A protein has these predicted regions:
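Bacterial N-terminal signal peptides that target proteins for export
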Residues: 1-12
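Active-site-adjacent loops and short helices of periplasmic peptidoglycan-processing enzymes
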Residues: 3, 28-199, 203-217
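Cytoplasmic C-terminal tails of single-pass
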Residues: 465-512
């Protein structure tokens, strides 16, 4: 009997454990590879295998990416989708959510959990429970000093708890297209369920650089924090990014760098995000899992410097609307006659002039292949043109309904290239053709006025023609009556003359 009880208890315990395991979500484990710096240095660079693409430099980072911010074009790719622990570059997402959900002057009160849930040996600025900072001051502390308690305080200020804030982080990451990311906290301290990839971090960085506040704060070399309700003294905070601030060395200072964030833990090794403007391009560089050499900033910053030099020297940014010929709308044509009626006006449809492509230096714009995709349900955007080169997307722009004065009747064939032909073939056509209509309102007004006058004239003529018909019928009846009277009169005259002759010759001559 006891043996039966033990058996039953074992089964129930096993079932309980199994249900407990199944009830918790599973997360992808970060693959740990025991690699030396030399092993990482000689790992394959995927972008170097792209046809007609400039060869990029070898770097010591296990994963690295360079992306152009406005187009999303990937210029350099090395293991960009591998999952890694991000360390403090996590705070880029924390700052993004703060900028999207807070005003800078909002007051943030530090809770007990925000201050004391972090390891005291980690990055912080020694805030106390109950201390009050503004959102802006917290952002300076997060981006310059990588303050973990400030990250916690911002998270609780926005979502109530750091756990709820982590859910917001994951939702926002998914919206940005991140596929290899899961956040577990707002600061980046080690957690096996807290990971991302170089590509995903570049997507997050691409979004946050749209905020001028991020550029201003992250690009500051230092910031003086005022005295607070619990601190009587000011605090000078320094940016830990060596390309922005001479925090420990001036060797890597670069005036083209406008933002960045550092990260380090023993499991993540060095991580770094850097934003720089080179050759008219905003370049976003992310390196992950870089092992230090013992020399200050090497190879972490030498890798980034080499990648920024490579991108700035080997690529060019080209405006689409200024170079696109297949989709150009000619403003001086009226039914392809080359004449303009009254004056030139804004076309009904035009290419968005803010669209760009990024191509290797020396490559002509015509080498990029456009693909046209129509957009439904948008009052302004009619279609999107996406360009590719060497099998990679290199930029896009929108075809817009201007909503202003409409120009000329112009039916112009648009050739969308090979990809456009394939798209049209799928729709049962032989080639990709789009006919655009431009209308001059003055012409429409003149034509409409002429049509109205013609209609009025026709109505008037119909009215007069009706009166004329009545008069004509009267005349015809009068003529018939007159003819009848004449005929009757003629008959009477004939009879009269006949009687007169008879009278003339019918006298009795013998009576004389």
């Amino acid at each position: 009997m006891k043996r039966l009880y033990r058996y039953t208890a074992s089964v129930l315990a096993a079932a309980f454990c199994l249900s407990a395991v199944l009830s918790f979500p599973s997360f992808a484990a970060v693959e740990e590879r025991n690699l030396t710096p030399e092993d990482r240095y000689y790992m394959d660079i995927q972008s170097n295998s792209w046809e007609n693409w400039p060869a990029g430099p070898q770097v010591y980072a296990e994963s690295a990416i360079v992306m152009e911010a406005s187009t999303g074009t990937i210029l350099y790719a090395k293991n960009i989708d591998d999952q890694h622990y991000p360390a403090s570059i996590t705070k880029i997402m924390t700052v993004l959510l703060a900028l999207e959900n807070c005003d800078l002057d909002e007051e943030v009160v530090f809770s007990h959990n925000a201050v004391y849930s972090i390891d005291y040996a980690s990055s912080h600025i020694a805030r106390d429970e109950g201390e009050i900072l503004t959102v802006e001051e917290c952002l300076y502390a997060i981006l310059l000093e990588s303050a973990n308690e400030c990250s916690n305080a911002i998270a609780e200020h926005i979502a109530g708890t750091t756990e709820a804030f982590a859910e917001m982080m994951n939702e926002r990451a998914a919206e940005l297209g991140c596929t290899n990311t899961h956040f577990a906290n707002p600061h980046g301290l080690p957690d096996e369920n807290h990971y991302t990839s170089a590509h995903d971090m570049a997507l997050i960085l691409q979004e946050v650089v749209k905020h001028e506040t991020f550029r201003r704060i992250s690009g500051s070399a230092n910031y003086t924090l005022r005295a607070t309700n619990l601190k009587d003294e000011e605090l000078l905070m320094n940016n830990h990014h060596y390309m922005i601030s001479a925090y420990k060395t001036s060797r890597f200072l670069d005036d083209t760098v406008f933002a960045g964030k550092t990260g380090y833990t023993t499991v993540a090794l060095n991580t770094l995000v850097t934003c720089a403007t080179r050759n008219g391009m905003d370049l976003l560089c992310v390196t992950m899992k870089t092992q230090g050499s013992g020399e200050q900033g090497v190879p972490l910053y030498t890798d980034t410097a080499n990648l920024l030099d490579y991108a700035g020297q080997n690529f060019q940014k080209i405006n689409i609307s200024q170079n696109e010929t297949n989709f150009t709308i000619n403003q001086n044509e009226l039914f392809s006659t080359g004449s303009s009626f009254f004056e030139n006006t804004t076309p009904m449809i035009e290419l968005d002039d803010s669209g760009y492509v990024v191509l290797p230096a020396g490559v002509d714009f015509s080498a990029a292949s456009p693909q046209l995709e129509f957009v439904d349900g948008d009052d302004e955007v009619i279609a999107t043109l996406t360009y590719s080169f060497a099998g990679q997307e290199v930029g896009s722009t929108d075809l817009l309904m201007t909503g202003t004065d409409i120009q000329e009747f112009n039916f112009q064939k648009i050739d969308g290239g090979e990809e456009g032909e394939e798209q049209s073939a799928a729709a049962g056509e032989n080639d990709a053709q789009v006919r655009l209509v431009k209308i001059n309102l003055r012409i429409v007004g003149v034509v409409a006025a002429v049509i109205i006058l013609l209609i009025v004239l026709i109505l008037v003529l119909r009215k007069f023609s009706g009166n004329f018909s009545v008069e004509w019928n009267f005349i015809r009846r009068w003529r018939r009556k007159r003819s009848a009277r004449n005929a009757f009169g003629n008959q009477n005259r004939i009879r009269y003359r006949s009687r007169k002759r008879r009278r003339k010759f019918n006298w009795k001559f013998w009576e004389k």
